[in-house]
Amino acid sequence: MSAKPTAALVVVSAFIGLFAAGAAAAPALTELVSLRSNGKQGNGISGRVSAPAVSADGVVVAFDSEATNLVGGDTNGALDVFVRDRATGRTERVSVSSKGKQGNSGSSGPAVSGDGRFVAFSSGAINLVVGDTNGRNDIFVHDRLTGVTTRVSVAADGTQGDNNSIGTAAISGDGRFVAFTSDASNLVPQPASGRHIYVKDRLTGAIERVSVDSAGNPALGFVAASPAISGDGRLVAFASSASNLVADDTNGTTDVFVHDRVTGTTVRASVDSAGAQSNDVSFRPDLNGDGRFVVFDSAASNLVPGDTNGVPDVFVHDLLTGATERVSVDSAGGEANGQSVGPGIRGGSAFGARISGDGRLVAFDSIATNLVSGDTNTCGPFYNDIAGECPDVFVHDRLTGETVRVSVDSAGAQANDASTDPDISADGSTIGFFSAASNLVAGDTNTCPVFPNPGHCPDIFVHVR
């Protein structure tokens, strides 16, 4: 049985009512965002290795792209990170130095602050900041207001990491705190082998390891990954195969944990409503704004009663009450007939489900055909040509129980190819996602290597509810 949340965690997580009011109703709209400022479509895959990131109000969308025509002067031949401002229609490249110089290696894994000003990303480039001589992948933050790019995967005294810092980072609402995954052994004074999760305070320069138990001992083993951070930066969720982070961790598989940076307490979130541990792997967490609700993917069959579909599902654990619920269900609560998580575009996000700021809405993708009526779309041959088993993006409302499909065009017509890897704005209004479909917006005709059919070059879209 996992440890219960501390009183301090309960206090910081409590809010008035179980759910905040939902986002105001608005006409449904699906929009292509991986465009040049003049509206020209990209000539390469967007969302090549990472999910899009959406600001709190859904206006700013960050994404990676292989396209060379989204901005002028893109000649590095590498994956870059871009930001699209949906209000102004401007697209800019943010994986650049403080002088605007393009990176000399690939960049990916964007995360954005609540107001869209700060963008964290991962890069192998060595020319984004002065003194980058470690020859390793690092985590950077670009300030879109000042143009300044800083490296955050460094020790408190500025010493650069002795190994790679990788994957998609997580950034607090105000952009001050950045959580990231690193193999480096010299970011904090206490050495530890393997891969760990760290949090950098961009205001003070302090850095701490958070993949630790409640006594501060580091996770044992190689894997700690997929950080998520609460809006104020206090709580950090992550996945780890370590068995020493909480008492009685005997399931021998990867679990999801939450560390409270104020109290030092670490709890396991991938448990059932009675606190019993899962019987299979759990991974890819996300946190709502105050950190009360943890969404995660799991192949476990014992987290909720009646889980008999034999495929991975999406769950939400309430750190205040201890309740765990399955959210990859239809509007009547029926379980999915296909997996809702997976290793990639063939039926599951490589980056996991996402939860709105108030914890009410969860965005996820699934190959299930029974989550909504009329799910009969077929993917292109590159992905999956079985009718219905084409991954789509869904949103489940935990207050009303309703599940809707959002990887549709503005009139509600289903996509003609795969859609995966969602992010949802904190206000719940906007869902960003990756799609190879050509029919979500009019005039989607771009092509790229591997995807020669017009319009089926993967792009980043948003659906406004």
Stretches found by the model and what they are:
Residues 25-465:
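Conserved "turn/edge" positions that cap or connect secondary-structure elements
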Residues 1-10:
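Bacterial N-terminal signal peptides that target proteins for export
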Residues 9-19:
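Bacterial N-terminal signal peptides
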